[in-house]
């Protein structure tokens, strides 16, 4: 697989923009002291900057495509961490399952109620 200098530059710019958004998000998280992770805030920063046209999608696409292509490798450290702390996971299995089911039910009921309000009660 051959890479041209233009492709390499596109990857550098793309990763630079992604990491800049991550850094800004981490800074906002640290500055505000919120419990929302900096990576999530950074993703929102990147989304908003693309939505308002500050950053073009074509600038971010090469790096994002590469990350998505090899995403499975990014789950290896998480899997190893889960195996290392499996006893803690089992000890907290009931709260984890309850919060997953409860959260899903809350989202389902809220979304159903909201859609009925927006679309009108046609059923």
From Swiss-Prot:
Major localization class: membrane
Signal peptide positions (record): none
InterPro entries recorded: LrgA/CidA, Uncharacterised_UPF0299
This protein's record includes keyword Zinc: no
Coiled-coil region list: none
GO cellular component annotations of the record: plasma membrane
Keywords: Cell inner membrane, Cell membrane, Membrane, Transmembrane, Transmembrane helix
Membrane topology summary: Multi-pass membrane protein
Pfam family, one: LrgA
Entry's localization field: Cell inner membrane
Annotated PANTHER family: HOLIN-LIKE PROTEIN CIDA-RELATED, UPF0299 MEMBRANE PROTEIN YOHJ
Record protein name field: UPF0299 membrane protein VV1471
High-level lineage: Bacteria, Pseudomonadati, Pseudomonadota, Gammaproteobacteria, Vibrionales
